[in-house]
Amino acid sequence: MGDIDEDIHIEMHREADELGKFATHMMIHAPKTMTRDEAAAALGELLSVITKRCMDHGADLVGHVKAFLKASNGAMSASLIDLGKGPNITHDFGHEATFQDAELTLHVIVHGIWDPEVREQSLEAIETVFKKHGLNYEIIKDYYETEKGMAHHGG
């Protein structure tokens, strides 16, 4: 699809739902072992920073910003629907649980800006927050570029 066709395609979606969306799946590695509280702090900060960046760049409403982290010894989920209230984080890690490697799935839905802007703000937030917390990451799948389009077009 050419750039002009893609712009028209995006505008059609904009008129239909006015929602900007982004999702990604990644692997995370902590060079130093993280406690569950450190992981929760990083995950909560990630959702807050993504949401704030989207709002600062034109979003006027949070649909849902959520993340699911899975490590060998447990899982953690975080959800944010109101920036003022902050994220809600749940997990099944034991009190002394630690991890170094995990999978992270992230979904971002906001109102008022388009997918490319949501993607850009999300990726910049990931870079900023993970760097601050000393986390390395590798994006396994960027659903904005692949499955999103295929699913939409019946692929």
Pin down the residues of each PLM region:
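P-loop NTP-binding site
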Residues: 2-155
